Amino acid sequence: MSGIVIAIVVLTILALVFGVLLGFAAEKFKVEGNPLVDQVEALLPQTQCGQCGYPGCRPYAEAIANGDKINKCPPGGTATMEKIADLVGVDPEPLNATEAVQEKKVAFIREDECIGCTKCIQACPVDAILGSGKLMHTVITDYCTGCDLCVAPCPVDCIDMLPIEQTTKTWDWQLNAIPVKQVQEEPQC
């Protein structure tokens, strides 16, 4: 056999042996994550806005799993906080005064002043802003969470945070807060 064939065979055998060893080591030393973190993260709104004091929803979910307060997520609101409280097994708390949003707001771009720099698009964590370079931008209000992250990067200050007009579509019906009483039927004669 030639030297090249021997080298190829030896390298192939070494690759297979090391592959088997790495596969075994990966299974043997596997690190399990906290399943509570994944469950809490699934309940959070995934806006990655940072209003809770953490850089995103995953770090906040990890903090909640480690015992941090559950009432720091303004975009999620009271409904999300109550679901997390039920999951974690703690009493629901009202949103912190510093985190609580008095009224829901959305971004509004004054299009006649917009220079199309795209800095607001890059800052928006939920892709609620449409536009492209050197063209006017606009906000999709149904997607906007009101996180306010698009306002600061705007070099011409053409973004305002405006309150949402209350309609039947935007009203918080709080259907989970309606008390339901179970009534037993009495046997009839």
UniProtKB/Swiss-Prot annotation:
Q: Where does [4Fe-4S] cluster 2 bind?
A: C114, C117, C120, C154
GO CC terms: plasma membrane
Which keywords has UniProt assigned to this entry? 4Fe-4S, Cell inner membrane, Cell membrane, Electron transport, Iron, Iron-sulfur, Membrane, Metal-binding, Repeat, Translocase, Transport
Q: What's noted on cofactor binding?
A: Binds 3 [4Fe-4S] clusters.
InterPro entries in UniProt: 4Fe-4S_dom (IPR007202), 4Fe4S_Fe-S-bd (IPR017896), 4Fe4S_Fe_S_CS (IPR017900), Elect_transpt_cplx_RnfB/RsxB (IPR010207), RnfB/RsxB_Proteobac (IPR016463), RnfB_subfamily (IPR050294)
Supply the Gene3D superfamilies for this chain.
Answer: 3.30.70.20, Electron transport complex subunit B, putative Fe-S cluster (1.10.15.40)
Question: Domain 4Fe-4S ferredoxin-type, which positions?
Answer: 105-134, 135-164
Q: Please report any disulfide bonds recorded for this protein chain, giving both cysteine positions.
A: none
Q: Which residues form the 4Fe-4S domain?
A: 32-90
Q: Where does [4Fe-4S] cluster 3 bind?
A: C124, C144, C147, C150
- SUPFAM superfamilies listed in its UniProt record: 4Fe-4S ferredoxins
Just give the chief location class.
membrane
> What EC number(s) does this enzyme carry?
7.-.-.-
From its record, what is one biological process in GO terms? electron transport chain
Cofactor(s) this protein cannot do without: [4Fe-4S] cluster
Quaternary assembly? The complex is composed of six subunits: RnfA, RnfB, RnfC, RnfD, RnfE and RnfG.
* Family affiliation: Belongs to the 4Fe4S bacterial-type ferredoxin family. RnfB subfamily.
What is its biological role? Part of a membrane-bound complex that couples electron transfer with translocation of ions across the membrane.
Name of the protein described by the UniProt record: Ion-translocating oxidoreductase complex subunit B
Record the organism: Shewanella piezotolerans (strain WP3 / JCM 13877)
* Gene encoding the protein: rnfB
